[in-house]
Design a protein with these regions (language model features):
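Short histidine-centered beta-strand/loop micro-motifs
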Residues: 38-43, 61-66, 108-110, 134
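Short acidic-glycine-tyrosine-enriched beta hairpin
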Residues: 86-102
Length: 165
């Protein structure tokens, strides 16, 4: 058995240059021994578990969808706004919701206190999982280059055989 207490899991902070996006993440799966870059299933978990904290009036990240990853959310405290293709709804403590591959979403703190939730992902983006993210508002893609390194690209529509023959 592997065991860890949340108070012992380091919290990682990340925010955008202008501050619109700001989050604190405790990656529980890594604390339990998951090797992020390993393709060996014995060194990976079948899912990723993290606890996320978003400060007031901030968003986790831009509106996006995953190509191969499903994400299950469980709100622990605070008040959040969840945007999807149909608009935005408010979620609070005890609410659970799921996004499957191709379903664009964005989580934002809609309250005066931190918005805190668990997220469980079935297909971690690290390693060779093949997941990528699409950002509909900007037309960008995030793809895994090597290990955990992401490359952000913005393409234009082209013919399938362009540059191939």
């Amino acid at each position: 058995m592997r065991k860890v207490n949340l108070k012992d899991v380091p919290e990682q902070e990340r925010k955008s240059p202008k501050g619109k996006f700001h989050k604190f993440v405790k990656n529980i799966s890594i604390a339990l021994g998951r090797e992020p870059e390993s393709l060996d299933l014995a060194k990976r978990h079948p899912f990723d578990l993290a606890i996320v904290r978003i400060p007031k009036r901030k968003s986790y990240c831009p509106y996006h969808s995953h190509s191969a990853e499903s994400e299950l959310y469980l709100v622990l405290s605070g008040r959040g706004s969840v945007r999807d293709k149909d608009g935005s709804i408010i979620v609070t403590e005890g609410d659970a919701f799921l996004f499957q591959p191709g379903e664009a979403h964005q989580l934002t703190n809609a309250g005066d206190e931190d918005f805190v939730y668990y997220v469980i992902a079935d297909n971690p983006r690290s390693g060779g999982s093949g997941d990528s993210c699409f950002y509909p508002d900007s037309g960008k893609w995030a793809v895994v280059k090597e290990g955990l390194e992401e490359v952000i690209v913005k393409g234009k529509e082209t013919d399938y055989f362009d540059g191939e023959e």
